[in-house]
Amino acid sequence: STNRYSAIMTQAEKVIAVSDSVVQYITEHYKNCPPEDIVRIYRGISPQEFPHGYQPSAQWINQTFKDFPQLENKFLVCLPGRITRLKGHETLIELMQQLQSQYPNLHAVVVGGADPKKAAYLKEMQDNIHSKGLRDKITFVGHRSDIREWLAFSDVVLSLSNQAETFGRTTLEALSVGTPVIGWNRGGVAEILSSVYPQGLIEVDDQSALLNAVKQHIDQPRKVKPVTMFSLKEMCDQTIDLYKHVLSLD
């Protein structure tokens, strides 16, 4: 946002941006911030916390099938994120409507809680799902503390936000454990996918491209190579180096 609070944050000697898209946003909206004062340091995750090839425990899987028996023996498409109009849930519903007859084994999982203020929107979505005959095709599992397990358990993860993500950490976490991600070509998500899994990139709001990408992943499951970028260590090292540089200027 371009409020006064955000403007104050651009008055420091150096401004850290978590992606190139944030660098561009600051440059365009905060003319008083010299471009040379903006330093791009990508956010990072721990490869130890999200190891390539990670699989949930048998106990977790058994409990999940007990809680959500409709997920068993399904091709799972996961949309992570809180319940808000910004996260692209309507796009997921349309996608499932288009795919359900051709792929009866396909099931969507929405991982994310709904703030009490969003209760009306959640009901609106559920009514939409019901009217389209998709109640047994889309499962809302609510807010979860075991996001790593859900990302690894899913066959494909979607990133369909209506606005550009500043970074897209959940996209990176999914790719890190080896789950393919399909997402719009904008913001931090596009930067991650371009570097790690370019076949998951689709043009913004191109519904037919999204449909085809999901079909391709169902018909021929893809492998994600181990992620060697965007580590927590890199982020910390670059941040400390920047602090040392700023201190040396005094």
Model-predicted segments: where are they?
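A charged, aromatic-enriched C-terminal amphipathic alpha-helix characteristic of glycosyltransferases
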Residues: D219-S248
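A short helix/loop element that forms part of the nucleotide-sugar donor recognition site in Leloir-type
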Residues: P51-Q70, M125
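Conserved acidic donor-binding segment of nucleotide-sugar-dependent glycosyltransferases
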Residues: S195-S208, V214-D219
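A short, active-site helix/loop in glycosyltransferases that binds the activated sugar's phosphate group
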Residues: A12-R40, I45-F50
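Conserved donor-binding/catalytic core segment of Leloir-type glycosyltransferases
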Residues: Q70-K87, I93-M96
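Short, structured helix-loop element that forms part of the nucleotide-activated donor/catalytic region
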Residues: V22, V109-R135
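Short hydrophobic beta-strand element within catalytic cores of glycosyltransferases
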Residues: P180-G183
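Active-site donor-binding acidic/aromatic loop of nucleotide-activated sugar
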Residues: K117-L122, R135-R144, W150, L201
